[in-house]
Structure formats: C-alpha cells, structure tokens
Amino acid sequence: MDMSGPSHHKLVVYLNGKFIPKEKAFISVMDRGFLFGDGVYEVFPVYNNNIIGLEPHLNRLQDGLDAINIKNPYSNKKWISLIRKIISLNKHNINHAIYLQISRGCDKKRNHTYEELNPTIYIQSSAIKSVKKDELIKGKSAITREDIRWLKSNTKATSLLANTLYAQEAKESNAEETILYRDGIVTEASSSNVFIVKENFFLSNPSKLNCSKKFLIFIRLNLSSSFDGSLTY
C-alpha cells in the first residue's frame, strides 16, 4: 500500500474514547508505547468503503495483544464501529489504510516491568495512493539485506526500528524497498510482502502467512495457480 503524498484535508483521529482533529491528539511522555515501543498495531486496508480481510486482521490484533499480555479493551463489534466511524469522518480519502495502535498505557515512572494499566488506543486513516498501470509494468527497485529483526515478527509490535532503518537504507540507495532474507530464505521486505509469480507457480515464504498474503494466495488458488514453497536468496 502506497500511503505517500500530502493531504490538504484535516484528518480526524480516535484517541482514548474521543474523535478529535489529528493536530490536537497528544499522549503522555510516560506512555509505554512512547518509552518502550510496548504495544501492537494493525492496518486495515479499505477500498471503496470495503474493509479487506476484516476478520483475519481482528484475529491478528487479538493474537498480538495475547502475545504481549494486554487485555483487548474492546469487542470486535466495537472495533468495527470505530473503524467505520473513522472512515466516515475522513471521506476525502477514497481508499484508506486504517492504522490502529494499542499501547500498554501510561505508568507513573519509566520501568521495564509493569502493572495492569489502561491501554492507550489510537486509530487514524491514511490515503492509499492508486498506482497507475504503467508504474506496475515498470516495477520498483529494491536492495537486499539480511533479516536481523527479532524472531516474533508475526506479532505486529510498534517497535519498528529495524524496518525503519532498512527502509531508509533503500531510500539512500535510490531504491524503493529492501528485500530481507534469513538463512538463505526470503522472509519479506521492510514494509511489504514478497511474491514471485513464475509460469503457473506462486512463490513466497510459507512461514510468513500474514493477512494480505493469505488473501492473495486465496485469489491465486481460485485462479487455478499453484502455490509452491519458499523463495531462496
């Protein structure tokens, strides 16, 4: 999803129970998401008002919260209501990437251990930029680097330092993405999935079956293409 490009409209976001202009959204400096990256996030793609893969994304959000021991503050029904409200309040975005973040919350002091806290909940909409056909045909440039991120990358943790550094390295190399590999196997890219469609085979890393990848595999299988194994580096 390409979310680049300036917006001339004022964005409305959701923060801890309130829908407010983005420029008025502030969190405490003692928030553990700010101090430690102690939280999880999820991104819901929305095209023509249709939330793509809603249930799988909500399931992954729950899995992420369970993995870091944060109680889910809302029911799925409540999350869906909030997401749809954000979409309606930001109608200037034709297609949306709905970013939802939950941190463990604010503590009284900076400490690695924690008590049960009230989570900080944030939701925003970013415009998904449409890509022209000639751009797709031309393709994008990429560099490759060894994947040295932590091994629980299926948990969508907010601490994306490694991904940020990989993306910046691509930018400084006049490339648009960094493709990552570990032990000779392609894992993913700094902010993208990686696939190769060769003849009638659909190649990707089967250990990284995230929401978008499952959706694309479903489409390919229904188009009578085969899914076959890992990409090697």
Task: Please state what every model-predicted region is.
Residues M1-E177, R182-I185, I217, L223, ...:
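Conserved alpha/beta cores of soluble small-molecule-handling proteins
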Residues I185-S207, S212:
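Glycine- and Gly-Pro-enriched alpha-helical subdomains that act as flexible
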